[in-house]
Amino acid sequence: MQETFKFLRCNSQGEAVEDKYSLETLKNHFVVRDEYNNLFRVFSSRDDFWEWEAAQPFEQKCFHEVVFGFLPQRLKFDIDFPVNKSYSNDNVDENVDDIVNDDDNVYDILDMIINVIMDVFYETYSLPYNINLTREQILLTDSIGLNKKRELKYSFHIILYTHSVLNNNEAKVFTSKVLENLPKHVYPFVDPQVNKSIQNFRIIGSHKKGSMRVKMFNEELADVFETSTTTKKSDTLIATPFETTCLPCIFTNVKETTPSSCDTIQQSELEEVLKFAGTLCKNHCFLRVHKNLVLFKRTSPSYCEICKRMHDKDNTLILRVTGNKVYQHCRHDNKHSLLMGSLSGTNNFVETYVDQVMTKSIEVHESILFEELPDPQKHIYDESSMREYERVPTLVVKAQMKIGKTIQLRNYLQKYYGNNSISKQQTIRFVTFRQIFSKNIQSRLPNFTLYSEVTGDLDSYERVIIQVESLFRLTSTAEPVDLLILDEVESIFNQFNSGLHKYFAPSFAIFMWMLETANYVICLDANLGNRTYNILQRFRGDVPIFFHWNQYKRAQHDMYYFTSSRETWLNNLLKDLLEDKKIVIPTNSLMEARLLQSFIQKKFPEKKIGFYSSKSTAHERESHFNNVSYYWGLVDILIYTPTISAGVSYEDKRFDVLYGFFNNMSCDVETCCQMLGRVRELKSKCYKICLQGKQNYFPETIEDIEMFTLQKRDTLFQTISNHQLSFTYNKETGRPIYYKTPYYHLWLETMRIQHLSKNHFITRFINQIADTGAKVFILTGEKLETVKQYTSIKMEIKHQDYVNIASAETIDANKALLIKQNLKEGITVDQQDLFAYEKYKLLEFYAWHGHKITPKFVEQYNSFMTKQNYTGRVQISRGKTVYESLTMLQTQELNFHQWAMQHAEHHDLQYNYSFQSHMYAIMLLTKCGFKCVQDPNILTNEQLMAKLVDEFVQYDLSAVSFEFKLKKPNKTDPQTILKFINKVLGLRYGLKIHHNKGNYYIKNTKAGSLIPFVRQQIKQSPCVVSNLLPITETSSVKEETSPIKETFTET
């Protein structure tokens, strides 16, 4: 059944589609433009059209699908390769005509376009939403032949036929992102105008009027590009594709009364989800599931906890499942929701990734540069014990723990430096990264001198075991050392960036002298990486590296169970404790360690807990770590943080299972994995790991890190324009010259590893475990009532800390300095003195000495964000204008930088320069139309949106996102840009551009409201005395005053 119309849009003659059909009703019909007869045809269904179309003569098959922009639609691309067509665009190669003169070049370009589409899809949907696209989900059609001018023309349609976007705006921006990523000479072949609000798109089997080029399936294309082989006609249609996966709304701001949905709730999960409805079901009954939403029908009036009022008519209740969390929503309030709880069996990212590892759909081994060495420079094998080490100038050994690396090292020393060897009198230096590791090594090499057991000059001892921080006790001599041993070499390199060195410069200098000049160097590590290769290649490049690698998988019998759910992890832990199992719990979070200790003590007061952290006394660490066999043999539960790593090993088979809790806010993946091996033998060989990590956006390559680092220092030498925040180089100071020293290169390598861990903590952790040969599984478990108790204890611990600090002794600067020195030198400090020192630092930070403080004060003002905002506000309000403040800060940091480069380069690299972050934050604020952080003016919605579009479409925000470690926003969406700007302003100043009743103004965040700008010091609370001159209100909006005035307190 069909109806015909002369026009699509309404007109006075009543002959248009819109005269009879509303946009809403057109959703359920199929609209076709008949080019041959110059008509629009409305069919009841697609099937009706296909049946009618089959009966039409070939020359009249000029049909185009009418795609309405407001409807969901497939992503599509129209590719044209005309012959002998001139292009006036300067960006196009002069030889563009020749590009399409043979099929091979056409196919090369087409393949390039498909690859870019897949790359943009991966960045937009796969990474954040885990929605994948393969070539088999891409459909290619062609229409090759002569056009109306009798010229040969290649034309292709690329359709992502298994996915759809919400509307034409989503499709339009996705297409623009593809175009941005195409090479300039390819850009003209892609039509950017195929996503209009009403779009005609040729239907399969049709041709344009006057041309015999028919759009058709092409098996050859599918074979060449490995794309879909479907010949189902409906797969080529664009509009209302019900059988597709609807992609998340990314680029446009669409208001909906129903929260967005994504993954479909499985039937196995529905029963558990419905349990969260609880008492809500007294007034509602289950209606149906729509993707990740559970919809309910109202049976009687009820009170809504979200709206805080009664609802008595419509069906307002919705439960949404995101990840493993269940949220309550109300259709009347789309801005707020209530967290109901967590599902025990819902797979989150960790579980999904483990599942992919289990099915071997992911390559877990990360190749390193040593593996690429030529065969004569490698010895690779797979045996349960180590083979003899080679006598070569630079030997690098990689093997898992407990395969015999140290045993073979002893054999090496005996063979080449024993009593019967010609080298027995030669100098050997064995460098370690921890004091306890040094003692551990000496117990296995008794003929070596331990640096901590002798005083004075160490050069007179031929064989010395020495920790990194004490290398300054050695001196360079005319003769190089014969053998330098670097056990746990990656950790040694890490230690140079620890900030714990009292005499960094001489220690690093002697290390580099030995590394560059030693006759022989042996590096050993189970977690060997590219950092070691790059450092050796750079500083021992004159001698070849030899790679000795035993690939034996000693961990092949170990079983690792992963989860992202703290609740699942805790329930498993509680179950094992109830079964009286002895547990090892490593974690890289001090708060989590303390929380677990308190939680277990309350649940199981009879159990003995061993607890070690950075807060443990120096005496306890030294005595216990030197005799772990005794002390750990006394406990039922062992909890520790990264204060225990390599060098501490418990060999007895006492503990049953290990529970690890790790996140990406602390040490890197390699250190976390090392922590798992401190107890060498578990009875069950079972490891249960909870991994948590927020998304980070740190620069990951050496090139990006170097660019970011030098850029921060580069801006210190530039002159600021008062009007546009543009820069020129200062004639007096000139451009900076950077000396790339050995430490600089080591620092870059270390930053790269840290950033990789922060950005990809979960995947790298699981990969490294799986690469050892261990079996990996998803951790599941019964649901128990533990989370509320756990959270309650966490709040108790935090509150007690606040109480302890607030009630601690008020000490003066002299005592504070003494405590600081004792802590730095490892001298035990009394717990009460530690709280007093924390109190002193808090009062000193805000210049709040002489005031009595409460636990609430400590909670609010000792937070990282409040302190960061306070510092930012102080720095930006020192001058009469923000530009004057910026110049003052720039001068201060430039002076430090120049001093550091002359005296202590490591201080420069470890210093957190803040000028550039202020410069970017103020730049964003001014581009929005505000003059400074205290601007009281108000912008209308139209004014701000226009600014966001005009100012940011052409502005590259990469440097800003690097600076603040934020994801770069989509520049085509003003609301996304505003969210990005508010994150920056919130991090730097505790401010945001707030929206209220169609107007925008600067307002404090929660942290910012604690530290108001004032003209003169006030007594009520810490504040920022601002020198910024007041700004005159110029807004046309007179009836409303910006709340920024509330933050500027007069006395």
From Swiss-Prot:
Alphabetical UniProt keywords: DNA replication, Early protein
GO BP terms in the entry: DNA replication
Pfam families for this protein: Herpes_ori_bp, Herpes_UL52
Positions of transmembrane segments: none
Induction note: Expressed in the early phase of the viral replicative cycle.
A single MF term (Gene Ontology): ATP binding
The organism's place on the tree of life at top rank: Viruses
Function: May be involved in DNA replication.
Family note: Belongs to the asfivirus F1055L family.
Name the UniProt record assigns to this protein: Putative helicase/primase complex protein
Species of provenance: African swine fever virus (isolate Tick/South Africa/Pretoriuskop Pr4/1996)
Lineage of origin: Viruses, Varidnaviria, Bamfordvirae, Nucleocytoviricota, Pokkesviricetes
